[in-house]
Amino acid sequence: DHRDLHLSLRRQRQMCIRDRLTSLQGLAKKLVEVPKGFQLQRQVKKIYDDRLKMANEEIPVDWGFAESLAYASVLSSGNTVRITGQDVGRGTFSHRHAIVYDNKTGEAHIPLQNFQGDKSFSIYDSLLSEAAVLAFEYGYSTTTPNALVIWEAQFGDFANSAQVVIDQFIASGEHKWQRLCGLTLLLPHGYEGQGPEHSSARLERFLQLSAEHNIQVCLPTSSAQVFHMLRKQVLCPLRKPLIVMSPKSLLRHKKTVSTLEEMAEGSFQVVLDDPKQSDPSIIKKIIICSGKVFYDLSAERDNRNLSDVIIIRLEQLYPFPHEALESVMAKYANAKSVTWCQEEPMNQGAWYSTQHNLRRAMQSNFGGLELRYAGREASAAAAAGYPALHLSQQEKFINEALN
């Protein structure tokens, strides 16, 4: 009887996933439709052609299309979506293309307005005052609880021009006035040699502001993760601001892609175990990290052919996922060292505000071990100004993490 019930439940789940997959494919195909005779610019046409292949499951889904699919899915469930920022129609790094233009006439076309009518999806390339736009979007999102309201910084670094809005309203508004707000901030963040003004969304500031479950701080590292995260933000009945350290180079990284099936099933995972995990009993070193640095560590580990090193990703830093992290770490009980690795300098990033949480997660299985740090040395500026210095710093801390 138990076996029959188990089989029946499994069949139901498979049918449910199949239905969701069919629905997603329908949304995906609708996203690449353009009016008859509409002439796309050459590179944009290539992106849309690739997206049609993604819709047909010929190639995996990249970040830009996963994000668009999340919006389409939210719209088809009857919610509205609103996006503002200095270059959001195209996306600062040319990944979104939510607005496309006819190469001959200059006419604009917005595929996401085909889902629930043009009133349900709004996207505006806004003026260059971060404080003004973010303040307006905060007010808008507090009064429109069923909308997915997003403000995207051109680079995460520029959010500091709106620090007053973040401190006075977004982080503390619920505590001061019991005003709930579901605003989402997409802040491109990542150390890629572009210097101190184009590397850091100042993750440490958001973590310092975190208390009483006031905000969520996430660093998604795959297409499926960003899809589930954005859907969860509006479909979950709890309204909290969502701060996302969004990617730059990862937008086109071959390892960040996901299948449509991964989007049709599952949910946002606050902790990701290593996809390359082998026999857990042979693991001697655990590295815990967040964001892009996972792919830098993973590439170097493969390069050195290290089979006894595991890399665990924290996709959410606040609220801290204690139980999820402890349960993943428990599998590697034979490990002899635990390291936190970050690409930010020691006085920045997650180290200062997260190390006590990491030590707590170690207590049950690794109480006798000391938590190690691997990352850049403390710095007054967010990042090095010279690409060569950036690379030498990265090689040094990746080496420290893996040795």
Regions found by a protein language model. Give the residues of each.
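Generic secondary-structure signature for well-ordered alpha-helical cores
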Residues: 29-36, 76, 170-175, 208-212, ...
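Conserved thiamine diphosphate
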Residues: 141-148, 183, 188-236
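Alpha-helix capping and helix-loop boundary segments enriched in small/acidic/polar residues
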Residues: 123-128, 153-160, 193-201, 214-221, ...
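Single conserved hydrophobic/aromatic residue that forms the stacking wall/gate
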Residues: 1-13, 17
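Non-catalytic terminal/interface segments that mediate subunit docking, oligomerization
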Residues: 18-146, 151-174, 260-312
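Short beta-strand segments
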Residues: 84-85, 184-188, 220, 243-247, ...
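Thiamine diphosphate
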Residues: 177-179, 190-206, 236-239, 251-403
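Acidic, glycine-rich active-site loops and adjacent beta-strand->loop/helix elements
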Residues: 88-90, 153-157, 187-192, 223-224, ...
